[in-house]
């Protein structure tokens, strides 16, 4: 069908039609509370705290508040799919730690794109008898309102219990001061101290460390070479990682489960605590009172049984991610629905919802370690004969002051060369991967990850030994701009019948991203040559999955153009809190999860001071 007035959908975008989700956002009547027999198993009508989302930020709120005696319910749109440890990292299996490239498929299977423009390619070879689309055809979850030139095409979400922490890299650096939002005004010393206090607690929850790869040959090859090449100019270290090394060959990667065991309580390990997790239960909106001063209900839908229920609580916390937090608010009458129109007045509730969003630029390449580096692995070895010959031997002098490598290194190399004489590489098969960084500084304002890990891209072809491969990922910051927006359709809904998210985003101009690319190219060349097919390149906008600023934090709603205060409380509402990277209002290049967790800890401290848990009858039982 041609794009003409004969097409009934030709001018659909200009009609007054609004979706059911948009109508619900402006509704004022409350549905009746369900009776006891109408609730899914284990669900009550009322709790002290209702949390939406089960990722590491939701788990932080749950841990802090459950341990303080609150009766907490957590609602997660996704399901439990991470094994016996609910919300655990899926890389915590021997299979994936032996072959990290296999984990790429796990990540790809978990990620759901946020906004996909309609493919305008015409299929002109269909049979004349086949139904053909109009110009406004919504197919396969595509978004007809998305401008492909202003999209974050790589942006995606994960809908499972544990969220993205079930497959993330576990990189948890602190924000350098230039990246951090202020928590204490006009007192830099006090602000530094507050951040240090919060970061320390968050690091303890995540089990962050910087020594898990200290006895990796590949890690030390890369680390020492870069330290040597940039001596006195740049500092290199292990990436701060949320992980615990269990053995020389196995690491337990942290996740939401590490922060808080998502098992229902009371149970045998926590007989006096109250917590319930409800997977496959979607939050559809929050209910405001007539005065718009507090939340009086949380609308949820059981995705298995199909029932819609309103839950009551003293405190409501949205931790469903930077996209879904804003989406739920827009579906509840906050901000505005529909394409932003500068001619219209700002909405009265959260006028800056979805404005000033940020996402990081990303440059990527892969290198194959140089012959010089590989030859240096055996610098302390005395090799007699040829592999496979009866007289073949590999020895070294333990503890010699002339050794270039420590004994643990030499012992691993010797054992591998003797046990696996068929292998031309002297690096043990199970040698841990490199995990190196040079952190964000004013002189080079980008974050770096020089490592070998699984992402939704960057798998290594089978013809190359992965022990030789080093991944280079450099992340750049983006200054918050009001014109960079995430908005929600009043006509189109997503797969869960919520207003469709749409991006209106462009990376600001400037030299910083190009300087970052140059830095990566120069630095990576010191380690080896580029892997064919993985030459230096800018990656899709949004592929970093570090979207921020969708519900910004600040001190004053109007002056700072923000949505929540420094306790993560929504302006004007005494009992609604938002958690996650959407709160971060600054230009940042580093991984934001640790910072978002720190803000959640501060938010919990406010909640514990201003709300009382209900009496716990379990406490009176022996």
Swiss-Prot record:
Kindly report the protein's main subcellular placement as a broad class.
periplasm
Which EC number(s) does the record attach to this protein? 1.1.3.10
Gene Ontology terms, cellular component aspect? periplasmic space
| Posttranslational mods | Not glycosylated.
Disulfide links within the chain = none
How does its activity hinge on pH? Optimum pH is 4.5-6.0. Active from pH 4 to 7.5. Stable from pH 4 to 11.
* Pro-peptide positions on chain: 29-37
Q: Which residues bind substrate?
A: 449, 451
Which residues does UniProt mark as catalytic?
546, 591
GO MF annotations in UniProt: flavin adenine dinucleotide binding; pyranose oxidase activity
- Establish whether keyword Lipid biosynthesis is in the entry: no
**Its job:** Catalyzes the oxidation of various aldopyranoses and disaccharides on carbon-2 to the corresponding 2-keto sugars concomitant with the reduction of O(2) to H(2)O(2). Plays an important role in lignin degradation of wood rot fungi by supplying the essential cosubstrate H(2)O(2) for the ligninolytic peroxidases, lignin peroxidase and manganese-dependent peroxidase. The preferred substrate is D-glucose which is converted to 2-dehydro-D-glucose, an intermediate of a secondary metabolic pathway leading to the antibiotic cortalcerone.
Q: Which family does it belong to?
A: Belongs to the GMC oxidoreductase family.
Q: What is this protein called?
A: Pyranose 2-oxidase
């Amino acid at each position: 069908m041609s794009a003409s007035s004969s097409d009934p959908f030709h001018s659909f975008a200009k009609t007054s039609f609004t979706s059911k989700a948009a109508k619900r956002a402006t509704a004022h009547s409350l549905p009746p509370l369900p009776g006891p027999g109408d609730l899914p198993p284990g669900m009550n009508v009322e709790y002290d705290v209702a949390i939406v989302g089960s990722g590491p930020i939701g788990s932080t709120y749950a841990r802090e508040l459950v341990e303080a005696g609150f009766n907490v319910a957590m609602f997660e749109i996704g399901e439990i799919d991470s094994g016996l440890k609910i919300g655990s990292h899926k890389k915590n299996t021997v299979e994936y730690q032996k072959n990290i490239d296999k984990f790429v498929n796990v990540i790809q299977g978990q990620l759901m794109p946020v906004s996909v423009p309609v493919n305008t390619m015409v299929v002109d070879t269909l049979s004349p008898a086949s139904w053909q689309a109009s110009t406004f055809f919504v197919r396969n979850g595509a978004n007809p309102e998305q401008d492909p030139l202003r999209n974050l095409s790589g942006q995606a979400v994960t809908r499972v219990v544990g969220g993205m922490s079930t497959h993330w890299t576990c990189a948890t650096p602190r924000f350098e001061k230039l990246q951090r939002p202020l928590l204490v005004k006009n007192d830099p010393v006090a602000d530094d101290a507050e951040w240090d206090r919060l970061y320390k607690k968050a690091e303890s929850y995540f089990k962050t460390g910087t020594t898990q790869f200290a006895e990796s040959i590949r890690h030390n090859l890369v680390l020492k070479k870069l330290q040597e090449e940039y001596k006195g100019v740049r500092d290199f270290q292990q990436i701060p990682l949320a992980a615990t090394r269990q053995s020389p060959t196995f690491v337990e990667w942290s996740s939401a489960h590490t922060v808080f065991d998502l098992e229902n309580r009371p149970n045998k390990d926590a007989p006096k605590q109250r917590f319930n997790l409800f997977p496959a239960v979607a939050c559809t909106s929050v209910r405001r009172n007539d005065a718009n001063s507090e939340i009086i209900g949380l609308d949820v839908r059981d995705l298995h049984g199909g029932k819609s229920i309103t839950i009551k609580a003293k405190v409501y916390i949205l931790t469903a991610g930077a996209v879904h937090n804003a989406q739920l608010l827009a579906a509840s009458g906050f901000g505005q629905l529909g394409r932003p129109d500068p001619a219209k007045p700002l909405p009265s509730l959260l006028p800056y919802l979805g404005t000033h969003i940020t996402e990081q630029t990303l440059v990527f390449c892969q290198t194959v370690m140089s012959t010089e580096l590989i030859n240096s692995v055996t610098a302390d070895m005395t090799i007699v004969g040829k592999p496979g010959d009866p007289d073949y031997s590999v020895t070294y002098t333990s503890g010699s002051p002339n050794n270039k490598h420590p004994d643990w290194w030499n012992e691993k190399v010797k054992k591998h060369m003797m046990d696996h004489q068929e292998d031309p590489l002297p690096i043990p098969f199970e040698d841990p991967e490199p995990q190196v960084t040079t952190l964000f500084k004013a002189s080079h304002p980008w974050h770096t990850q020089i490592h070998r890990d699984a992402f939704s891209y960057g798998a290594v072809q089978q013809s190359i030994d992965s022990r030789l491969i080093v991944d280079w990922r450099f992340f750049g910051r983006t200054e918050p701009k009001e014109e960079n927006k995430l908005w929600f359709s009043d006509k189109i809904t997503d797969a869960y019948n919520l207003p469709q998210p749409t991006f209106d985003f462009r990376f600001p101009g400037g030299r910083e991203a190009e300087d970052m690319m140059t830095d990566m190219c120069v630095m990576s060349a010191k380690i080896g040559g580029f892997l064919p097919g993985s030459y230096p390149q800018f990656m899709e906008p949004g592929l970093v999955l570090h979207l921020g600023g969708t519900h910004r934090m600040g001190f004053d709603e109007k002056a700072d153009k923000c949505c929540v205060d420094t306790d993560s409380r929504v302006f004007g509402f005494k009992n609604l809190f938002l958690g996650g990277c959407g709160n971060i209002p600054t230009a940042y290049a580093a991984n934001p999860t640790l910072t978002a967790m720190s803000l959640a800890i501060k938010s919990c401290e406010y909640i514990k001071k201003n709300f009382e848990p209900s009496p716990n009858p379990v406490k009176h039982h022996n």
